[in-house]
Amino acid sequence: MSALALPGSGARQRRFGGRQAFIEKITGMGLALPATILLLLTSLMPLVVLCVMSFTDYELGAVDFEFIGLANFSKAMGDPVFRRSLWNTLLYVGIVLPGAVCLGLLVAILVYGRKRTRSFYEIVYFLPVTSTLIAMATVWQFLLHPRLGPINTFLHMIGAGEHAFLSDPALVVPTLAVIGMWQLIGFNMVLFLAGLSAIPKDLYEAAEIDGCAGGIDRFLTITWPLLGPTTMFVIITTSITAFKIFDTVAVMTQGGPMGSSEVLLYSIYLEGFQYFHTAYAAALTIVFLVFILVFSVAQSFILERRVHY
């Protein structure tokens, strides 16, 4: 015996369903409202204030200011200190990026093949990531001391002479880059280990049957192509982290000697909190953010075309 639908029951169900969906939508928006307000207050509003301030002549402590258009940006383009800090930053990134990515991949491959000692090596290589860089910078200052540091002592023992790593303009940025790589290798290793774990072992067995017996052949034909997405992520995160160098410069060199280690973030810090040129520091910050954005988008576009999923 078939059930008979009551007249108007379908319309009532549609109205009830629409009312229920509306209530759920309002409830969801209400639950998301506190997080949205927090995001606006902590992220978007400071960025808006920063953009507005970059078009003024405001200095820290001043009671009034005037809008001066693009004067701060034109000043930055002609500022030799800004150009020098930009070059030092690019040099630092140019050393850290390939070094941290390649060494992180190498360490991940070596650790991945371990059985009993894998956890031990993972902890050892990841320790620099968990350490406070400001505290470790003090340790590095001692290690690199021209007379008391063990590194120079070892170099003197093997006849390589003593080197003023932090006071030689030609060595200071590469030295800071080595410290940056030391901190990033462990983090990149963990990411590459995750990528290696996702590669099916059947592919290696099939490649071995097809005559790809050597480790280098397996790496070039299977491991490296399938690590494409992981490598793209590692390159982008490493480059952004490298561009944000500040702690080691502030603690170890303060931009010296003679500005040879002054990087973008440290220049922004000096302009804003030492010279109180707040508006000019805001303009430099905008340039810095735009530069990182363009660099990251360009990296993503180039790497995306070469990644094999």
Describe the residue ranges of each PLM region.
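Short, Lys/Arg-rich, polar N-terminal cytosolic tail immediately upstream
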Residues: M1-I23
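A structural signal for multi-pass alpha-helical bundles of membrane permease subunits
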Residues: E24-Y309
